Amino acid sequence: MVMNERDRKQRLYVAEQGRKLAAGKISRREFLRRAALAGFGVSAAGLMRMQTARAATSPVRLREGIYQLSDDQKKWLETVGKRFAGTTVRIASESTAPSQIISDLAKQEFEPLTGITINWEQQPLDQVLSKITQDTATESSSNDIYYLDQAWVGRFVEDTVDPKALLDDTSSELNMPDYNFDDFVPELIPALAAYQGRLVGLPFDIPIFVYMYRKDVYDALGLKPATTMAEFLENVRATDMYKAADGSEVRGYIGQWKSGHYALQCDWTAWLWSHGGSHTGLDGAVLIDDEKAVAGANYMLELGKHVPAGVTTWDWGGQGDAMAQGLGANVISWAEFFPGLDVPDRSKTVGAWETADLPMEIELRTETSFDEKPAIGHQGGSCIALSKYSQVQEAAWIFLQWATSAPVAIAAAESSNTPVRTSAFSAPNVLEKAKVTAGTTRHFPAVLKAIKERMGTEPHFPGWAAASGTGGPIPTELGKMTTGAQDVATTLANIKKAIEEAIAEE
């Protein structure tokens, strides 16, 4: 679809709102609302990352031998890549773990071999969106590679170069030897990087929910990891009020239940979806108040009888801290928390937490709208794509392949970054760190299984971000329910109305 004048004006409008946000003239929530009205929503993980922007870290230091190119790959960078020495490739992305790790690695390894300079600007997601909408509206070449939240993939499909078409050109010297596109975890391609069968970018990151439990507590009580939702609740009840060796009290469940915060919406989806509910049904219908959703809400409130004090003030950061402090025994949440639990100066529970397969949902709804996919493994992720407006496309394509290649994915996994390539999950350095240690990868098997079999995706329509994000009506109403200020029926009725209004704004 060629960009029309209405689309162009919408993009320029979003770019202008981004500048207002950066100048402090509007709030982030207002930016999300205005961007949504222009047709640019943000995914679940995008909202999470937006509110947990990482501070700059010291450059990554890899152990000897972790980053290993094949001889053909190294020769290709030194010969084909070197043709573009002196070229600068520009990319703007969020400041996430993979962006930090790979940008550091580019300075250390890619630039010396090729002579290509990588200008990687790391910003909040709202500013990334502002840049991309400005660039595409004006067909500017100011960024050569786009970082795309999964909710934007369909909107920018015509502004990118199809990477599969480039990879399928077997005669091109610009294609990286041994790149092996089929090594990407296949479930990630349609979820993060494709639109209506057309590849838009290449998978880059994948936050996802996993089941984490206190093995020391389970062992003491003779428990096994839950395989069903009923068993999970039984384990929550059985572990609640457990007395640890130091005399501290362990509660049954740790939530991310901060009233009005997007984290609460994330937590809620696990119980909604696992009970056969969903936000949407066929043809844009909103089903959030049906009997399945009611069952999910009641299950959530039952968990709420077994949580530490203060849970309704915790976002995902508070939840992660509570895990590290040993305040609970069961969690279904973001796998990104897990490596920090094995760091002695951050955690009182080093080695105590384990992962297990997510408990099976009672049932799953299969007929939904707006790309919603109910499943307990709440996911979110992004891809990176080649701009069709870039004036240095060949150099940018060389870098894009290197940045998403198996050797780089394996090196990034050294810092506990969740891989998007199958080979990285079984690489020797990854398996070596599957033990209790800083930078552990012992949670990776649970992550891979969640990606391949249990991924759940929130709806993707423009108004979703403003409705479900922090300060929006959905987490605000959920907060009333989890604090006892409002009953389930009223809460779900109000959420239904909010979602219907958000859809109507398209």
Question: Where is each model-derived feature located?
Answer:
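N-terminal secretory signal peptides
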Residues: 1-30, 52-54
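N-terminal export signals
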Residues: 30-56
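Hinge/lid segment of periplasmic solute-binding proteins
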Residues: 60-83, 150-209, 249, 264, ...
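Short, well-ordered beta-strand elements
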Residues: 64, 85-96, 116-121, 144-145, ...
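Extracytoplasmic "Venus flytrap"/periplasmic binding protein-like
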Residues: 105-187, 216-227, 322, 329-330, ...
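Extracytoplasmic/periplasmic solute-binding protein
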Residues: 191-204, 209, 233-286, 292, ...
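Glycine-centered hinge/linker elements that transmit conformational signals in sensory
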Residues: 235-240, 282-313, 357-361
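C-terminal capping/gating helix-and-loop segments adjacent to ligand/active sites or protein-protein/ligand interfaces
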Residues: 439-498
